[in-house]
Amino acid sequence: MASFEAQQETFDCSEYGNGSCPENERSLGVRAAMYSLMACAIFITIFGNLAMIISISYFKQLHTPTNLLILSMAVTDFLLGFTIMPYSMVRSVENCWYFGLTFCKIHYSFDLMLSITSIFHLCSVAVDRFYAICHPLHYCTKMTIPVVRRLLLVCWSVPGAFAFGVVFSEAYADGIEGYDILVACSSSCPVMFNKLWGTTLFVAGFFTPSSMMVGIYGKIFAVSKKHARVIDNLPENQNNQMRKDKKAAKTLGIVMGVFLLCWFPCFFTILLDPFLNFSTPAVLFDALTWFGYFNSTCNPLIYGFFYPWFRRALKYILLGKIFSSHFHNTNLFTQKETE
């Protein structure tokens, strides 16, 4: 805190209110409504994804390579809800960052890391579904648990190294005129990407993996269409497995679509803002960020709607049956679903 105060003495902070929080122009009713909506989203994000984590971890029937990827993605969403969204809620409603400059960087690093980690997970899931549907005979040898673990290592380590490296080196702000004064004097936890890093983040962290996902799912659904024409002539067990794989691909394709819908506006704004002389209103950027956060709220709702086994697992968790001995061997699939 002392270094922050020293910076304020070095710069003329009169334009920025000398680092103090501006008077909140929102009425008490508006703030209460914002807190209620955001707290509800945080609650669903934390406990919905926690239920998914417990379900896949506890029930042995769910220990598959695909579900291991979904488990890790649920951990990503849970961490976003638990460690990022509460602080962002206070900043958004109160129009002020109360937690200091160092924690601002830590917070933004985790925020950036988790959003990129999510898209890396979705790419991995797309690859998993590609082998399951397009190359089913090779699936068991290509998508083994050790392979999935290596994929998860990449999904977490690369975004983490990128996010913390860029934010703490402050490379993202090189060449931005007046940024030092803004950081020293502002009370809003300002993070602004220059043209180079804004473009790099959009291309490497969003556009390229998104394009890969869309291409892979396009191939998956093209192959699924071919399978649909011959599926009735297949042996019953192979027929049923293909139907299950197709349904799983459809569900995870919806998860991918919701992710792209929620996060594209935020990433696109990060790309454009430095070319528009950082003219994006703070309120708009804040709203787009929360629109991205809501993706992590939507995921457990999507799983609950499309996966009957998740609804059953949630019921068992709420009833406390998971504390019974040997309950982890319970069958979560009906006869119709396993056929």
Curated annotation (Swiss-Prot):
Principal cellular location given in the protein's record: membrane
Sequence intervals crossing the membrane: 37-57, 68-88, 107-127, 151-171, 196-216, 252-272, 288-310
Keyword Secreted among UniProt keywords: no
Tissue-by-tissue expression: Mainly expressed in neurons of the olfactory epithelium. Also present in the limbic brain areas receiving projection from the olfactory system and several brain regions, including the hippocampus, cerebellum, cortex, raphe nuclei, hypothalamus and habenula.
CDD domains noted in UniProt: 7tmA_TAAR2_3_4
One Pfam family it belongs to: 7tm_1
Positions bearing carbohydrate: N18, N277
Cystines in this chain: C21-C185, C104-C189
Membrane topology: Multi-pass membrane protein
SUPFAM superfamilies in alphabetical order: Family A G protein-coupled receptor-like (SSF81321)
Gene Ontology MF terms in the entry: trace-amine receptor activity
Extracellular side: 1-36, 89-106, 172-195, 273-287
A GO term from the CC aspect: plasma membrane
Entry keywords, A to Z: Cell membrane, Disulfide bond, G-protein coupled receptor, Glycoprotein, Membrane, Receptor, Transducer, Transmembrane, Transmembrane helix
Phenotype caused by lack of the gene: Mice display increased locomotor activity and less immobility. Mice show elevated tissue dopamine levels in the striatum and an increased dopaminergic neuron number in the Substantia Nigra. They also show an increased neuroblast-like and proliferating cell number in the subventricular and subgranular zone, indicating increased adult neurogenesis. Mice lacking Taar2, Taar3, Taar4, Taar5, Taar6, Taar7a, Taar7b, Taar7d, Taar7e, Taar7f, Taar8a, Taar8b, Taar8c and Taar9 show no visible phenotype or behavioral deficits.
InterPro entries xref list: GPCR_Rhodpsn, GPCR_Rhodpsn_7TM, TAAR, TAAR_fam
Localization per record: Cell membrane
Residue ranges annotated as Cytoplasmic topological domain: 58-67, 128-150, 217-251, 311-339
UniProt record similarity statement: Belongs to the G-protein coupled receptor 1 family.
Protein function: Orphan olfactory receptor specific for trace amines. Trace amine compounds are enriched in animal body fluids and act on trace amine-associated receptors (TAARs) to elicit both intraspecific and interspecific innate behaviors. Ligand-binding causes a conformation change that triggers signaling via the G(s)-class of G-proteins which activate adenylate cyclase. May also be required to provide olfactory input into limbic brain areas to regulate emotional behaviors likely via modulation of the dopamine system.
Domains as described in the record: In addition to the well known disulfide bond common to G-protein coupled receptor 1 family, trace amine-associated receptors (TAARs) contain an unique disulfide bond (Cys-21-Cys-185) connecting the N-terminus to the extracellular Loop 2 (ECL2), which is required for agonist-induced receptor activation.
Protein's recorded name: Trace amine-associated receptor 2
Organism of derivation: Mus musculus (Mouse)
Organism lineage: Eukaryota, Metazoa, Chordata, Craniata, Vertebrata
